[in-house]
Every structure is written in structure tokens, then in C-alpha cells.
């Protein structure tokens, strides 16, 4: 997960944020925890980190939930964003430098859409609502990020917010850039008519306007690989005339509960706020999520939480001792494992080994317990 240059240089990361229509669940927490670890690793290496995260504060799911609950969509978004930030702070997930709502970036979106229309990479679908679409074949490299074949792309496009059956499109995979205004929907003025942004172009516009080209990392959950991240990169590459939006594309695995992926549609969410409300310490939640590798799909359970709580207790007992075994090697190994694809299971195992030695055999290094606690805090974000 190294950045492009040495200590003191800038390291840049854009991570897709939430659509704020419901509370933060453990799937969200696991994703943002993964990028928090990268953030912390870069800071430890001495980089000046420019981390940007968006919030999709105008989108169909948000508008539908607001209509269902009889609440203004802006009030709903503001409420859920506030709760999300509260949960992230409780989990000690460092805030990005820039936290940007889609509604704050309308002018940037309009500028990108204008450029794509001018170059022929976008077109207007004739009809009652003149929506603007991006041509999936506008860049030769389209598809490199996901590596999916066309059949897989079409299936995921339909499942994840795309509209392959939309009449008038040149290609079923062409993605919405600008949704022309409909009655009862929020809209903004533009040279090509009132409307609102498509999902993917929001992120391209925010990333380019806040960071620019050549990101070190574009990141998010693995369910965003296609179509969202593929099209976000394609939009940016098309406008900038570049082959690659980011040096690395990083995706966190999904969190399941009771044998199924955790999702709003399934109704099996484990909410961070609910766990906190039950008195579960956020540090234990964090450790439970760190017990699995960030890229793998994994399951949350009461056993995972119990094991994390016990681990936290042992670590705190060991680091409260007046002395312990030398800490140099264990801290070096934690850094080494995190630098190797964020291998948190090995990092936690190394700390477990030091903890066992400290509790079972003691030690003579009076600085060691404090050094271990400081390293765990800085590198893993767990306060002991």
C-alpha cells in the first residue's frame, strides 16, 4: 500500500462514502476501517496524506426513503451523515481531509459533463426526459479495473443501479451522467437543462477537483468494483486523456451475519449504534473487524465479538504492567505485516505473542508496555 514517493511526499486517496439514508452498519465500518489503516500507515511513514471521501447526498435510495418516511431529503441526509460521523469517531476512524457531498460538487459535475458532450464521449437520449449518457466505449481501456466480461458487467450493471433496458441508449452499458429534471425531484440548473448528477460522475468530479489526476488509491467496498469504480475511473480518464485514474484500486470485502451478506435490502444489518447502545466498547468492535483480512468476505458473530473483547482485555492488562519483554521486535513485525497488504491477522497474532510473554513470564523493560500501547494506538487505532 505504499504511496508513490518517500517520506514527506503527498499520498492521495479517494474513498467512496455512504448514501445517507440509514444508519452505519458493520459493513460500512469494515470498509472505512481498512482505509483508516492505510491512512495510519502513511502517516507513520511520514507522508502528507490528502484523503478525500464523498457522501452521495442526492440519489434515488435517499429520495425514496425520505418520501416513505415523510421527511425532507436534505434533513434525512443531514441526520444520517451526522450519525455516520459519530459512529466513525467512536471507532477512532480518522476523518478525511475533505468530506464532500455530491450536492456541493454540482458545478464540478456540470464541467465534466460539458467536456464529455463536447468530445463525443456523451450523448443526449431523446424523449420526454433528455438524460445524458456516457459511452462505455469512450476509452479503449474500459474494463481494466474490474476485469469482468461483458455478460458479468451487464448483470452487475442491472443489479447495482444501472439501466441497461433504457430506450434510446447506444449501448446497454452506457452510464447515466445527468438525469433530466422530473416532477417532484430535486434538480440544479445547467447549460444542458435542469437535472441532477448520475452516481459515477459525482465521484469523478469530486476526486479530480479536490485531488486531481494520478491518485495513489481509489477505494471502497468490493460491491463498488463494477459499475461504480469502473465508470468513475473511465469518466476521469476520458476527460483528462489519461490511461489510469489511480495507481492502485483497493476494495474491502463484505461483512456477513448469519451466513448472509449484511445489507439493507436483506434486513440483517448489525448497526454500530446498536452495539454501542448495548454497551459494547467501540475498541472491541474495531478489533473484531481487524481479526479478518480486509479484502476477504467474512462473517460477524457473537463469538467474534467475545474473542475481540477478551483480546482487548489481555492487551490492556499486559500494557498496564510496570515492565515487560522488549517491544522492538513486536512493533517492527506489526509494521511489517501491515505493510504486507494490511495483514491484520498476523499483526494481531504478533501482539498476542508479546502479550502472552508479558503476562506469563514478565520482563525487565520498563518502557516496553508503554511503547506497545502507543504503537497499537497509532498503527491499529486501538486505545489501550
From Swiss-Prot:
A GO biological-process term: mycothiol biosynthetic process
Residue numbers covered by motif 'KMSKS' region: 261-265
Xref: HAMAP family: MshC
SUPFAM superfamilies: Anticodon-binding domain of a subclass of class I aminoacyl-tRNA synthetases (SSF47323), Nucleotidylyl transferase (SSF52374)
Higher taxonomy: Bacteria, Bacillati, Actinomycetota, Actinomycetes, Mycobacteriales
Positions of short motif 'HIGH' region: 18-28
Role noted for this protein: Catalyzes the ATP-dependent condensation of GlcN-Ins and L-cysteine to form L-Cys-GlcN-Ins.
Keyword Transmembrane helix: no
Quaternary context: Monomer.
Keywords from the UniProt entry: ATP-binding, Ligase, Metal-binding, Nucleotide-binding, Zinc
Catalytic function, reaction form: 1D-myo-inositol 2-amino-2-deoxy-alpha-D-glucopyranoside + L-cysteine + ATP = 1D-myo-inositol 2-(L-cysteinylamino)-2-deoxy-alpha-D-glucopyranoside + AMP + diphosphate + H(+)
Cofactor note: Binds 1 zinc ion per subunit.
Pfam families documented for this protein: tRNA-synt_1e (PF01406)
Name of the protein described by the UniProt record: L-cysteine:1D-myo-inositol 2-amino-2-deoxy-alpha-D-glucopyranoside ligase
Record keyword Metal-binding present: yes
Record InterPro entries: Cys-tRNA/MSH_ligase (IPR024909), Mycothiol_ligase_MshC (IPR017812), Rossmann-like_a/b/a_fold (IPR014729), tRNA-synt_1_cat_dom (IPR032678), tRNAsynth_Ia_anticodon-bd (IPR009080)
Motif ('ERGGDP' region): 159-164
Cofactor(s) of this protein: Zn(2+)
An example molecular function term from Gene Ontology annotations: cysteine-glucosaminylinositol ligase activity
Family as reported in the entry's similarity comment: Belongs to the class-I aminoacyl-tRNA synthetase family. MshC subfamily.
Residue numbers binding Zn(2+): 16, 203, 228
Record EC number: 6.3.1.13
Name of the gene encoding the protein in the UniProt record: mshC
GO cellular component: a single term: cytosol
Listed NCBIfam families: mycothiol_MshC
Domain of life, source organism: Bacteria
Binding site residues for L-cysteinyl-5'-AMP: 16-19, 31, 54-56, 199, 221-223, 255
Organism in which the protein naturally occurs: Mycobacterium avium (strain 104)
